[in-house]
C-alpha cells in the first residue's frame, strides 16, 4: 500500500536572509515573540515508511539540534540551487552513519551541486565527506522514496523554473514561487495541506507577496494552507496572522503539523 505523510515539522520559515536580519532594528527583528525568529526555509516530513527532508539550507545543523531528531533520512528533496536551500548539504554528514542519502533535484540544480561541492561526488572520496548521491527528477514524473510517492511539478521563481513537490496524496510543498503553469495546478487537487511561500506585503520580482499567496491558496483549495519563506517585511507574526482567512496560517520555526 502507498504511504502517506502523517507528521511534518517546519524547520525554518524564513527567507534567504533569515529573520532577524543582521543590522536591522525594526519591530520584527527586535521582537521578543519566538515566532518572529525565522531560520532559512526547510521542512522535515514523516510518512508511514520514510523520513524526508525538503531543502537543506545553511541553518540545517542548528535546525536538527533544535528538533533533537537523529534518525535515518531516506531522501532530500531540493527545490532549487539557491544557497538558502542547499547551503547545509555538507551538514548531512552525521546522518550518513545510517547509509548513503539520495538528493533529488532537477538536472540544473544537480549540475550546480556538482560544481559547488565536487568533493562529494568524486569516485574516491576523502574520509568524512558526506555520503550523498544525486538523483535527477523531472516535473510530472513520479518516483518513490520507500513506498511514499513523490510528484515533482514546475513552479516559476521569477524566470527560473524550479520544483515543487507533492508528497503522498495529502501534502504539497512550494517555495520561492512567483507563478505556476496550469499543468502544475492540475497536480494539486484534493490536498489536505499546502505549504507555500509568502514573502512580504509588497510585490517582489521573484517571490509571491502575501496577497498573491492568498490567491494561490484559494485556487488550490487545500483544507489547510501554511505560508513559509517570510521576510521581516511581513510584519509581526501575531498581527499578520490575525489578518488571514480561516484555514490559512503563517508557519513558524518548530511548528508541527499532524495530518
What is the meaning of each model-derived region?
Residues 19-77, 81, 87-95, 180-187:
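Pre-active-site segment of Zn-dependent metallo-hydrolases
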Residues 53-57, 74-82, 105-106, 172-177, ...:
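Active-site neighborhood of phospho(di)ester-bond hydrolases with catalytic His/Asp-centered motifs
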Residues 57-60, 155-159, 177-180, 231-233:
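Short beta->alpha connector loops
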Residues 179-259:
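Cap/insert and terminal regions of metallo-dependent hydrolase folds
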Amino acid at each position: 500500500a502507498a504511504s502517506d505523510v502523517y507528521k511534518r515539522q517546519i524547520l525554518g520559515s524564513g527567507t534567504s536572509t533569515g529573520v532577524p536580519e543582521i543590522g536591522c532594528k525594526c519591530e520584527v527583528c527586535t521582537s521578543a515573540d519566538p515566532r518572529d525568529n525565522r531560520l532559512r526555509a526547510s521542512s522535515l516530513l514523516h510518512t508511514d515508511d520514510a523520513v524526508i527532508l525538503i531543502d537543506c539550507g545553511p541553518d540545517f545543523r542548528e535546525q536538527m539540534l533544535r528538533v533533537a531528531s537523529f534518525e535515518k533520512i531516506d531522501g532530500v528533496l531540493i527545490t532549487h540551487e539557491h544557497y538558502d536551500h542547499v547551503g547545509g548539504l555538507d551538514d548531512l554528514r552525521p546522518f550518513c552513519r545510517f547509509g548513503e542519502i539520495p538528493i533529488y533535484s532537477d538536472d540544473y540544480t544537480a549540475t550546480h551541486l556538482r560544481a559547488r561541492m565536487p568533493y562529494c561526488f568524486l569516485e574516491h572520496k576523502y574520509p568524512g565527506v558526506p555520503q550523498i548521491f544525486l538523483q535527477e527528477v523531472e516535473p510530472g514524473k513520479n518516483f518513490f522514496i520507500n513506498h511514499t510517492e513523490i510528484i515533482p511539478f514546475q513552479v516559476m521563481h521569477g524566470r527560473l523554473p524550479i520544483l515543487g513537490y507533492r508528497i503522498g496524496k495529502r501534502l504539497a510543498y512550494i517555495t520561492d514561487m512567483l507563478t505556476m503553469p496550469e499543468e502544475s495546478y492540475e497536480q494539486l487537487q484534493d490536498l489536505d495541506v499546502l505549504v507555500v511561500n509568502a514573502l512580504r506585503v509588497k510585490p517582489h520580482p521573484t517571490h509571491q507577496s502575501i496577497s498573491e499567496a492568498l490567491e494561490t491558496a484559494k485556487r488550490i483549495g487545500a483544507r489547510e494552507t501554511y505560508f513559509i519563506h517570510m521576510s521581516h517585511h511581513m510584519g509581526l507574526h501575531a498581527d499578520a496572522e490575525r489578518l488571514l482567512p480561516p484555514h490559512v496560517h503563517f508557519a513558524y520555526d518548530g511548528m508541527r503539523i499532524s495530518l
